[in-house]
Amino acid sequence: MRPPGFWTRPPTHPLARLLAPVGRVYGGLTADRMDRPGAEPPYPVLCVGNFTLGGAGKTPTALALVRLLRDLGRTPALLSRGYGGRLAGPLVVDPARHAAAEVGDEPLLLAQAAPTIVARDRPSGARLCAASGADVIVMDDGLQNPSLTKSLSLAVVDGGVGLGNGLPFPAGPLRAPLARQWPHVAGLVLVGEGSPGEAMAAEAESRGLPVHRARLVPEAGSDWAGRRVVAFAGIGRPQKFFETLRSLGAEIVAEWAFPDHHPYRPGDWTALSALAAREGASLVTTEKDAVRLPAEARTAVAVLRVALAFADETRLRQQLAAAFPRA
C-alpha cells in the first residue's frame, strides 16, 4: 500500500476531513484494544512498534536491540506476525527453506540474526520463543496488539515524516489517537533527522520519556561512488533509499518505486532487467526487497545493506539493562 498524499498534508485537507469520522471510530476501537490486559509471557517481552501504519525503521531497530541484549548477556528471540506471509504459525523461520510469500520479508531478515518465530497468535509464538532457548522476546511490531504483556515498549519514529497529519487511519497514518498511545510507550527511537521527528522528540521528553536518536548507516566496504544504477524498492519510503544511494555517490539513472511489501513477479524482473540493460546500469535494491525477488534474480542484483547506529548507545543500554536484568 502506498500512503495517500493527503496523509502528509494539513489535517484540514478535504479528504482528511471527509474520512475523519471513520478515523475516530477506527482509532478509538484500536485504543480500547490496546488498553486490554495481555497474557503473561514465559519470558519478558521487548516490543518494537510505531504509532503509525507503514515503515519507520522497526526492522533495523529490532536487529540493533538483539545485538545490545546479547551484549547484556541475554539470549533473545524475535517474534513477528509475518506480515505478507500466508503461514499462520507458530513456526521457526528458516531462511534456507521459507520464502517471503510464506513468512513475510521482515522475518527472513530477522532470522539471519537470531531465532525468529512467526505467529499470528502472539502467546503461542512466545511459548515457541521460549522453547527455542530464548530468555527475552523481541516483538517486531505489536505496540497496538494487547495479547501479550510487555516489559518494555519502544516506539520507532521516522524523523523525516513524524506522524504525518496526526489523524487516525483512514484520515491519516495513525493507528490510534496519539494521546492514547503514549501511556503504552517507555521510550522513543528517532531514526533520521527532520523537524517532524524533532516535534515528536520534544513531546516525548516533555512526558519524561527517553529519546534514542539513531541513523541508518551503510555497511562498511560498500563503494557506490560513480556507479550507474537502476534503483528499485518496495518499502515504506522508497525515496529515502534513493536519497541514501545518491549521498553515497551513486549515479541513479532510473528509479522504480513499488508498493510496500510488493511481491515481485517474473514480469517485474523482466521489466527491471530490460531497463538496466538499456541504461547500461546495475540493478540495486534494499535488503528487504532482495528476499522477495525471484530466486534467479537475487544473484544479479546489488543490495544496499544498512545498520542502525545510535547517537548515545550507552543510554539505551542502561534502559535495557534496567528492564531486563540478568537473573
Curated annotation (Swiss-Prot):
Catalysed conversion reaction: a lipid A disaccharide + ATP = a lipid IVA + ADP + H(+)
InterPro entries xref list: LpxK, P-loop_NTPase
A GO BP entry: lipopolysaccharide core region biosynthetic process
Alphabetically ordered keywords of this record: ATP-binding, Kinase, Lipid A biosynthesis, Lipid biosynthesis, Lipid metabolism, Nucleotide-binding, Transferase
Ligand binding (ATP): 52-59
The organism's place on the tree of life at top rank: Bacteria
Pathway field: Glycolipid biosynthesis; lipid IV(A) biosynthesis; lipid IV(A) from (3R)-3-hydroxytetradecanoyl-[acyl-carrier-protein] and UDP-N-acetyl-alpha-D-glucosamine: step 6/6
NCBIfam families linked: lpxK (TIGR00682)
Family listed: Belongs to the LpxK family.
Full protein name: Tetraacyldisaccharide 4'-kinase
Organism in which the protein naturally occurs: Methylorubrum extorquens (strain CM4 / NCIMB 13688) (Methylobacterium extorquens)
